[in-house]
Amino acid sequence: RIARGKVRDLATARAAEFDGIAFPGGFGAAKNLCTFAFDGAGMKVQPEVERFVREAAAAHKPLLFACISPVIAAKVLAQGVEVTLGADGPIAGVVAQWGARHTPIAVTSCLVDRHRKVVTVPAYM
């Protein structure tokens, strides 16, 4: 809703055009980028978001996921990706079901999965 500069449809974007990609958190991410807000462990990621994350990961682009959006990394990249949702126990169990690894950290820290080039920050989690 708040943007600076040009905004375009994700369907027209390609990961190769970017040096890195950041996904915001908050309720908007949990209900618009994916269905986690409504479906929890049964969530689906919006198709263009999933395509873009997979494309960026395949191109070894750094990916940042904040607040609740690490569930997107956990669902799309799944097996072995290391993420954090802060100290949130219930959601940590959900991402483990998908094959991701959750590491609890303080809200003032970040977690870097160097192998996958994925950075996650808990924000309010």
Question: Can you describe what each PLM-predicted range is?
Answer:
Residues 3-125:
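Active-site-adjacent pocket-lining segments in enzyme domains
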